[in-house]
Amino acid sequence: MTQPPTVAAVLAAHSRVVEVGIGARPDVAAALAERGCAVTATDIEACTVPETVRFVRDDVTDPERAVYEAADAVYALRCPPELQRAVVDVAGAVGAACYLTTLGGEPVVVPVSERRTVASGALFVARDA
């Protein structure tokens, strides 16, 4: 039986990505950078990220558009319902695809075009590029 892909394997189809709300979990961003993606990570608090990942302090509810403009995908992992709309909006503003995972059993509160099974659970496609 074939194992589902990792989130990084799915997102690696994009060359420039922004992770919103990286917090203390840079694993996916690091894996994407290892696959050759240009990765920018954002959070409202200062975070430690691998040298291969660019970090920018930003609040997605009041985003600095320049942080996202070059991205062809914006994603948020363990994204709480109250931030989902802001993540989708910033992706839409720059013409980027948008992917979300949720926290445990929390719902997706934005429209999604696809639910992909990944090794860690579900990856929701909230916006195609």
UniProtKB/Swiss-Prot annotation:
It comes from the Archaea. Pfam families: UPF0146. InterPro entries: SAM-dependent_MTases_sf (IPR029063), UPF0146 (IPR005353). Gene3D superfamilies: Vaccinia Virus protein VP39. SUPFAM superfamilies: S-adenosyl-L-methionine-dependent methyltransferases. Belongs to the UPF0146 family. This is UPF0146 protein VNG_2609C.
